[in-house]
Amino acid sequence: VTSRELAVMLSPLGYRKLSATDGILRGEAVGASYPVFHNSWRDKRATHEIWVGVSGFGKTFGLNCYLTREYAENGIPFDMLEPMGHGKHIADAFGLPWYVMSAKATKLNPQDVMFPTLIEQVSHVTRIYETVLGRSLSGAQRENLERGLLGEALEILYRGFPDLNKVSPELAPTCDVVCDVLSGLGDKEATKPIAKNLADEIAGLCTGSGPWAEFLNGATNVDLSRGGRERIEPRVFSFHELESDPILQALAYTQVLSAIRRDSLIDEQPRIIAVDEVYRLMRHPSLLDFLIEAAKTFRTRRKKLVCVDQSRANSRRVVAHLC
């Protein structure tokens, strides 16, 4: 290409690529001097990426282009999580399922099994309830007791199943069942009221007419399971209808990422997990910890994590934990 004008005229045909050039088009050098190609799949382990830029600089558009090229040229499927509804464009382009999370129509049960061991699963559910409660269940004596009691209630429920990994969303215990079991725990006079009060607090938020009951209390109605498939096609998850409630949005991000992480353990097929506006998870420290833990799993299973954010400070926090 000898001029920018000619490049614009030929843009529908794409860039010419030398046979020795490996990878797909990722963008242009500064000043549009030359195209940049990159192959993310040379190594057995995936390479994660963090994109940073202020609003309006084309991060989301660039992400759509990247996912489109990887899928169209290399057949690399992806899971896209985005908060603004722009995912509809890429879903329409490929005829993909577009999952829109809604406070009124969506249910995501916190007790859905996302981890292979009981200890990991209980820790995951506890993290979700910490986010719902807006406080940590550790540190001081009372909080430590609350954490132990909640963990005991969850263990009682999960031990009722012979195989944890075969607990389907239809069988997973719901929030009201957790509260019922929790309210009856405590082997000493001092711990009984703590268990009862914690159960009442969770029930007031997640059951009955609680602010998050419609979203959290019930069987999950979004298909997040692998369902015996050898390959999962690309999926697009949009969270724009949860924009008014940042806690619900963060919880939805976490449950979807948890399901993706769970399925990533099964095979080493290359896949891209793209999380747009990752700062929405970073508002909640326990959920940020989960993202960092998941990223380490993704890499060893050839799953590339692409985090898109507006804050360089947030990105440094993620990089510091992954390096």
Predicted regions and their residues:
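P-loop NTPase motor domains
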Residues: S3-V36, R42, P83-K303
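Hydrophobic anchor at the beta1->P-loop junction of P-loop NTPases
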Residues: W51
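The conserved Walker
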Residues: S55
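Conserved lysine of the Walker
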Residues: K59
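Hydrophobic positions on the alpha1 helix immediately C-terminal to the Walker A/P-loop
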Residues: G62
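Post-Walker A helix-loop "phosphate-sensing" segment adjacent to the P-loop in P-loop NTPases
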Residues: R69-D79, F94-L96
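A short helix-turn-beta junction within AAA+ P-loop NTPase domains corresponding to the substrate/partner-engaging
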Residues: L96-V100, V318-C323
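Sensor-1/coupling segment of RecA-like P-loop NTPase cores
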Residues: F298-S315
